[in-house]
């Protein structure tokens, strides 16, 4: 009988050990499977690299959670769960509970990839601080970071990089407390479901009239449908237009811009006709440019070697006048990781050698996503250096008259958050900004947002827009618009109309007298004088411009010919217009013209006749001195006999605007041989 009891005991003992062995083998197998996926999220404790990848955490989380439920005293699993939740964006607050458990069993001999490890690494403190930081619990985060520093000292951890990072995180939390306590007066709105998706949507760029939006998306349906190793769809560029009810449903911009690789928006010209895009180029990362011809985008062209190097260039933006490129690069010779650089457009139309923007802008950390406002002096960019409140923050800096940049200023909370805030563009009037960010009420991983400033003054700029037609009312083709400063004679911008719609758009800064010249082959130029005074307001001006053909009888008003008061002496402000006239005459050597002077109704008919003749003759004399044969031009004065507008209003009062239109010089084609 005793023998039977003994055999039964031995049988149960062996069975129990076999079950334990099987359970142990199953745990080891499941752990190794989870660990392989987990490493997509967490690289190693030494470099504390977290990758915010949907593919990584979402795949690893359920496997590790299942193991943890079987062994809730396993602090290695608690640590890994904390990492997964920390990288999940929407469940970060859940990370705190698991890190709180993990720090109760810290080991200096952590072997996280071993299924036998039941303790957690020292860096659990740092990640716990990150979780508090990202959840706006700044005092708790500071306390945990300080505990982390103390534990490193106690354990004689001499890793200076980790110590510096912890101290820097404390400074970020202190900055965050200050910024959150004094929020910017701003209304932040999600651009909505027609723009944003459940996937990552970011890097918005807009035309100056805020009617056309381009952005980058990793949504399902991307060209080629490929995914990266983290499970994200490849980047494509999408567009949306403003309607009476909001933004239209975003659609892919299509070929030849979107391919089966990665394409992202980085910059847009004010008129919305030129896009700067980022292409992955097998990890090299380069900037390309593409322009709109009617409603068809051209094949993207890679910018030259002064911009694109063998290193990484992830973002760029061109100034509104097209003269300066601001871009990001991690090339050697900078101040840290990624730095901001500038390049000037050469007279030959190429980008010149890049110049680092210097230590006022660049730090030992990363700067990215530059945006230069249409005013030409206000720079916005993202940085995880300077006084960031966490991750990348948006900063602004002003260009002074001596060419130096002011100390960057954090644009504040709630635009900036403890997380990454990047890709920020501002409307010409300065009252709205568009940016991408992760927010708790968003649709996806990152969404595009609009910020409306509630206590900010308008930026004093003038937006010029309109259409250019030919003599028949049809869209004029190949129109070039040249904007010149009449005082300095310097060309400040050259623009082109859309070949399908005839539309144009450009920005004028205040305090200048402009010659705006519209030109197309086979047509007389049309010039406009625009005096933009020093002002405090933002203006939008719409123009319908018509070009007259080069044929007998066609005429134009020379709106940028100026004389001293009551005299026939050409003022220096006329030089740009005289140069345009000279080019017109040289380009059409068989053309003869009449240059006519006109006055308003003030003064005697005899006096006005003499003044108008003298002024017409002054223009002819200038062209003759520049080499145009005198027999091709006839100077004629009409005095006040041919008014272009009424000198008086219907009620008999004076009409200053009409008088100004009447005081003019015209050119008329009289003969073409």
List the predicted regions and their residue ranges:
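A short, solvent-exposed loop/turn motif at the edges and junctions
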Residues: 517-533
């Amino acid at each position: 009988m005793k023998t039977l009891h003994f055999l039964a005991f031995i049988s149960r003992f062996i069975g129990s050990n076999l079950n334990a062995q099987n359970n142990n083998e199953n745990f080891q197998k499941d752990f190794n499977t989870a660990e392989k996926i987990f490493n997509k999220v967490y690289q190693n404790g030494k470099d504390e690299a977290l990758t915010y990848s949907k593919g990584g955490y979402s795949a690893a989380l359920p496997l590790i959670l299942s193991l943890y439920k079987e062994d809730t005293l396993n602090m290695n699993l608690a640590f890994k769960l904390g990492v997964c939740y920390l990288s999940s964006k929407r469940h970060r607050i859940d990370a705190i509970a698991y890190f709180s458990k993990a720090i109760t069993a810290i080991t200096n001999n952590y072997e996280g990839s071993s299924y036998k490890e039941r303790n957690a690494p020292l860096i659990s403190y740092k990640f716990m601080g990150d979780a508090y930081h990202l959840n706006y619990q700044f005092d708790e985060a500071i306390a945990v970071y300080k505990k982390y520093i103390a534990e490193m000292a106690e354990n004689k951890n001499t890793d200076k990089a980790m110590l510096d990072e912890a101290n820097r995180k404390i400074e970020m939390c202190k900055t965050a407390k200050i910024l959150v306590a004094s929020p910017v007066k701003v209304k932040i709105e999600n651009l909505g479901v027609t723009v944003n998706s459940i996937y990552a949507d970011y890097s918005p760029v807009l035309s100056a009239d805020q009617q056309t939006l381009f952005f980058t998306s990793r949504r399902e349906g991307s060209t080629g449908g490929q995914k990266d190793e983290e499970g994200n769809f490849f980047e494509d560029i999408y567009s949306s237009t403003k309607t009476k009810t909001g933004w239209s449903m975003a659609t892919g911009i299509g070929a030849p811009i979107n391919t089966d690789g990665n394409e992202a928006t980085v910059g847009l010209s004010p008129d919305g006709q030129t896009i700067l895009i980022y292409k992955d180029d097998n990890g090299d990362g380069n900037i390309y440019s593409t322009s709109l011809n009617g409603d068809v985008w051209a094949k993207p062209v890679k910018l030259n070697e002064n911009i694109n190097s063998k290193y990484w260039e992830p973002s760029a933006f061109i100034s509104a006048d097209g003269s300066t490129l601001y871009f990001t690069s991690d090339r050697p010779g900078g101040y840290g990781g990624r730095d901001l650089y500038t390049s000037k457009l050469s007279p030959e139309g190429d980008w010149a050698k890049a110049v680092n923007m210097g230590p006022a802008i660049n730090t030992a950390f990363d700067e990215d996503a530059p945006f230069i406002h249409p005013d030409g002096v206000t720079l916005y960019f993202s940085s995880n250096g300077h006084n960031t409140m966490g991750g990348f923050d948006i900063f602004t800096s002003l260009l002074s008259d001596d060419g130096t940049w002011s100390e960057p200023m954090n644009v504040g909370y709630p635009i900036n958050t403890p997380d990454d805030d990047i890709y920020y563009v501002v409307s010409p009037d300065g009252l709205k900004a568009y940016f991408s960010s992760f927010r708790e009420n968003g649709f996806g991983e990152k969404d595009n947002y609009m910020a409306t400033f509630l206590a900010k003054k308008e930026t004093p700029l003038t937006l010029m827009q309109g259409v250019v037609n030919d003599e028949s009312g049809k869209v004029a083709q190949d129109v070039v618009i040249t904007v010149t400063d009449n005082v300095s004679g310097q060309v400040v911008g050259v623009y082109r109309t859309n070949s399908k719609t005839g539309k144009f758009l450009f920005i004028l800064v205040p305090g200048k007298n402009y010659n705006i010249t519209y030109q197309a082959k086979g047509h007389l130029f049309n010039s406009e004088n625009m005096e933009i005074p020093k002002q405090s307001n933002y203006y939008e001006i719409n123009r319908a411009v018509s070009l007259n053909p080069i044929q007998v009888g066609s005429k134009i008003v020379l709106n940028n010919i100026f004389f001293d008061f009551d005299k026939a002496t050409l003022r220096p402000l006329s030089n740009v217009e005289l140069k345009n006239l000279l080019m017109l005459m040289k380009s059409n050597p068989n053309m003869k013209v009449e240059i006519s002077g006109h006055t308003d109704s003030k003064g005697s008919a005899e006096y006005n006749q003499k003044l108008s003749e003298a002024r017409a003759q002054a223009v002819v004399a200038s062209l003759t001195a520049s080499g145009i044969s005198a027999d091709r031009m006839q100077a004629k004065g009409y005095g006040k006999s041919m008014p272009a507008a009424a000198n008086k209003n219907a009620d008999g009062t004076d009409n200053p605007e009409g008088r100004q239109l009447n005081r003019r010089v015209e050119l008329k084609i009289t003969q073409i041989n």
